[in-house]
């Protein structure tokens, strides 16, 4: 493109120079004009390549680039003069001078115009991407540094807001600190702000809620920087800002990992993750990849989801980690044993499961096959292959279960606790509440309802649930694997349960609406649902806190013969009897545990 443009401008300078001089200047013949044009063109391009003119970025043209251009044009004119003298024993100085001036003006002008247009576009872009940064501490300065390090930053930080009065009226990173949060609204109006970026990674949830409400009043777009844990693990950088989500306003303090202990358990090891294409399984894979395992086996029965997570992880970590994909069903016992024998994983995270309460109420046999039989297959195969640590992803619905899904999870816990008695593998279970943002969870459902204009459906105004984010749940699972000693149930101190109706209201407000514009409708409790969930029952309560925010519950082994008898018989049971026998099996086990305690 540039070469073609320069060719046109060089030839045009010869023609224009001739037209300017023809009435007062006589050439020997038309061949002299042709010789001048060809000589100037060829010598100019040779000089341009010698001086690397075509490797320069002309949108950043400066004095240095113009001097190089001047050298090339002057040298090509000199070469042309020598050729003219060799052929005609004279040089056409007036024509050469005219061509030199016209080339310099036209070619140099296009370079300068390119820069002027680029600067104009950048100024327009900057005018629509001016950001006010909340937080002038280490997080805010780190984020500003990364934003400004880009050649063409998408967002231009223009000022800081910070409640620390000692920083007011100072300049940090060249940006003024103009006041505390009471200055947010005036700053947005005065500085023509388009974005507010909350850059305090350690901000407590209540403080974030208050700050967010203040920012919402301005009417501009609100962003937030990643949490320090995400930056520490390398999953996000300070400059990768994002929209504020319902999870941020949930009231949960993220779990801080013991990265050294996790690294000791995972670095250089072979890790297998079942359900690797699911919400939790895929996030576990992302986070353990930061600890440099030797290889990760991505196991799942959905080819599209497995291909998606493989493509993502191999692109990010493929230079240092070998990723294997295995399309398989955990209900296929022979396949599980074959894969365990093939890879001999050091650590297994068993995330494959059916989790939707209403669906499992209507399909109890499928819940048993996947959550119970599947867990037994994977756990026994891991035991056979000499796996060091086996982590079962369980649920708070396994506590005093009132539905089929919870009962099958409770059953699965009992299976691994019994295996842990006789195996060298450390079997542990991790229990947590509902996961925000996972497929089929309330957040995606509420979002779709809001997009349609409502109503947002909530079962009961008093219904509460414990909630975790997907990254937080995955961190707990990984940390549990690092802490595992065997036959343990890890439970996160999840703080206070959250009212579902409050979560719905927050999401409506985050979407820019009021509850008058998008109403909330109460539909009644569904089959198998409880008004509230528990994390431990009375037989499991244990005083020990093994890690900040992580408690240990006492292992419940259950009555192994009763459990195995159910597994042997369930295929022949009608649906009503299956549900009754399932609950009878786990309740008998609970009674035995309670009796042994007393």
UniProtKB/Swiss-Prot annotation:
<keyword id="KW-1133">Transmembrane helix</keyword>
<dbReference type="GO" id="GO:0005886">
    <property type="term" value="C:plasma membrane"/>
</dbReference>
<feature type="transmembrane region" description="Helical">
    <location>
        <begin position="1"/>
        <end position="21"/>
    </location>
</feature>
<dbReference type="Pfam" id="PF02719">
    <property type="entry name" value="Polysacc_synt_2"/>
</dbReference>
<dbReference type="InterPro" id="IPR003869">
    <property type="entry name" value="Polysac_CapD-like"/>
</dbReference>
<feature type="transmembrane region" description="Helical">
    <location>
        <begin position="87"/>
        <end position="107"/>
    </location>
</feature>
<comment type="function">
    <text>Involved in biofilm formation.</text>
</comment>
<feature type="transmembrane region" description="Helical">
    <location>
        <begin position="31"/>
        <end position="51"/>
    </location>
</feature>
<keyword id="KW-1003">Cell membrane</keyword>
<dbReference type="InterPro" id="IPR029063">
    <property type="entry name" value="SAM-dependent_MTases_sf"/>
</dbReference>
<dbReference type="GO" id="GO:1900192">
    <property type="term" value="P:positive regulation of single-species biofilm formation"/>
</dbReference>
<dbReference type="InterPro" id="IPR051203">
    <property type="entry name" value="Polysaccharide_Synthase-Rel"/>
</dbReference>
<dbReference type="InterPro" id="IPR036291">
    <property type="entry name" value="NAD(P)-bd_dom_sf"/>
</dbReference>
<dbReference type="GO" id="GO:0000271">
    <property type="term" value="P:polysaccharide biosynthetic process"/>
</dbReference>
<keyword id="KW-0270">Exopolysaccharide synthesis</keyword>
<dbReference type="Pfam" id="PF13727">
    <property type="entry name" value="CoA_binding_3"/>
</dbReference>
<keyword id="KW-0812">Transmembrane</keyword>
<protein>
    <recommendedName>
        <fullName>Probable polysaccharide biosynthesis protein EpsC</fullName>
    </recommendedName>
</protein>
<comment type="similarity">
    <text>Belongs to the polysaccharide synthase family.</text>
</comment>
<feature type="transmembrane region" description="Helical">
    <location>
        <begin position="63"/>
        <end position="83"/>
    </location>
</feature>
<keyword id="KW-0472">Membrane</keyword>
């Amino acid at each position: 493109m540039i070469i073609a443009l320069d060719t046109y401008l060089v030839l045009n300078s010869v023609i224009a120079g001739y037209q300017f001089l023809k009435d007062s200047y006589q050439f020997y013949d038309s061949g002299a004009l042709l010789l001048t044009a060809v000589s100037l063109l060829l010598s100019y391009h040779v000089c341009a390549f010698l001086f690397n003119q075509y490797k320069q970025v002309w949108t950043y043209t400066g004095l240095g680039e113009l001097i190089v251009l001047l050298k090339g044009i002057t040298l090509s004119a000199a070469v042309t003069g020598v050729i003219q003298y060799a052929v005609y024993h004279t040089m056409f100085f007036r024509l050469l001078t005219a061509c030199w001036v016209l080339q310099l003006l036209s070619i140099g002008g296009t370079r300068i115009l390119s820069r002027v247009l680029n600067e104009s576009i950048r100024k327009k872009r900057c005018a629509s991407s001016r950001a006010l940064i909340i937080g002038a501490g280490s997080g805010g300065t780190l984020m500003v540094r990364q934003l400004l390090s880009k050649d063409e930053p998408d967002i231009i930080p223009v000022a800081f807001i910070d409640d620390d009065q000692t920083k007011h009226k100072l300049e940090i990173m060249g940006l003024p600190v103009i006041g505390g949060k009471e200055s947010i609204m005036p700053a947005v109006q005065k500085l023509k702000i388009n974005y507010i970026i909350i850059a305090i990674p350690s901000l407590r949830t209540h403080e974030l809620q208050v700050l967010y409400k203040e920012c919402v009043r301005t009417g501009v777009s609100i962003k937030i920087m990643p949490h320090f844990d995400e930056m520490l693990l390398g999953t996000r950088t300070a400059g990768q800002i994002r929209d504020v989500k319902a999870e941020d306003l949930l009231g949960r303090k993220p779990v801080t990992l013991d990265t050294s202990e996790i690294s000791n358990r995972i670095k250089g090891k072979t890790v297998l993750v079942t359900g690797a294409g699911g919400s939790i399984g895929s996030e576990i894979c992302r986070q353990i990849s930061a600890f440099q395992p030797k290889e990760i086996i991505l196991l799942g029965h959905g080819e599209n989801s497995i291909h998606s997570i493989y493509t993502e992880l191999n692109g990010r970590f493929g230079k240092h980690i070998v990723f294997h994909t295995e399309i398989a069903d955990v209900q296929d016992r022979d396949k599980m044993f074959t894969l365990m024998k093939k890879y001999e994983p050091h650590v297994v995270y068993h995330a494959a499961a059916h989790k939707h309460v209403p669906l499992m109420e209507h399909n109890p046999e499928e819940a048993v096959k996947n959550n119970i039989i599947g867990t037994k297959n994977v756990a026994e195969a891991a035991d056979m292959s000499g796996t060091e640590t086996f982590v079962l992803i369980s649920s708070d619905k396994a506590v005093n279960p009132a539905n089929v899904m919870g009962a099958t999870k409770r059953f699965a816990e009992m299976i691994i606790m019994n295996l842990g008695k006789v195996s060298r593998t450390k079997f542990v279970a991790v229990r947590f509440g509902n996961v925000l943002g996972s497929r089929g969870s309330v957040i995606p459902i509420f979002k779709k309802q809001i997009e349609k204009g409502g109503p947002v459906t909530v079962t009961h105004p008093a219904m509460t649930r414990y909630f975790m984010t997907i990254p937080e749940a995955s961190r707990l699972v990984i940390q549990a694997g690092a802490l595992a000693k065997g036959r343990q149930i890890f439970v996160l101190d999840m703080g206070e349960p959250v009212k579902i109706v409050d979560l719905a209201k927050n999401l409506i407000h985050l979407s820019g609406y009021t509850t008058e514009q998008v109403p909330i409708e109460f539909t009644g409790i569904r089959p198998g649902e409880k008004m509230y969930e528990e994390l431990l029952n009375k037989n499991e309560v244990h005083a020990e806190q093994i890690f900040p925010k992580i408690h240990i519950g006492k292992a419940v082994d259950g009555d192994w013969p009763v459990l195995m008898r159910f597994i042997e018989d369930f295929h022949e049971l009608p649906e009503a009897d299956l549900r009754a026998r399932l609950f009878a099996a786990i309740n008998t086990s609970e009674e035995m545990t309670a009796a042994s305690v007393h």
